[in-house]
């Protein structure tokens, strides 16, 4: 199965790029989206310097995080150059 990688703009204004997995069984109000290898995008910087792991490794070593899809304002397909840099940085 191919990874689904998207740019997510969250309601709090953060912009992330991440692999996304859907949770098949969940309770209403519980997280229903898994982000794998999420990275924060600093839109003021170029792709090489504008991606940082999210949350920071000083906070957790986990590479997966669950969120409510309600926290996502929109999702878009990443620009090919952004996708390429993301794949380099997570490998």
Cite the ranges covered by each PLM segment.
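Conserved RNA-binding domains used in RNP assembly and mRNA/RNA metabolism
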Residues: 1-91
């Amino acid at each position: 199965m191919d990874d689904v990688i998207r740019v997510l703009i969250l309601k709090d204004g953060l912009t992330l790029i991440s692999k996304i997995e859907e949770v098949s069984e969940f309770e209403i109000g519980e997280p229903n989206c898994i982000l794998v290898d999420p990275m924060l995008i600093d839109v003021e910087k170029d792709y090489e310097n504008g991606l940082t792991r999210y949350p920071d490794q000083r906070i957790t070593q986990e590479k997966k995080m669950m969120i409510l899809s309600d926290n996502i304002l929109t999702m878009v397909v990443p620009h090919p150059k952004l996708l390429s840099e993301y794949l380099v940085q997570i490998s």
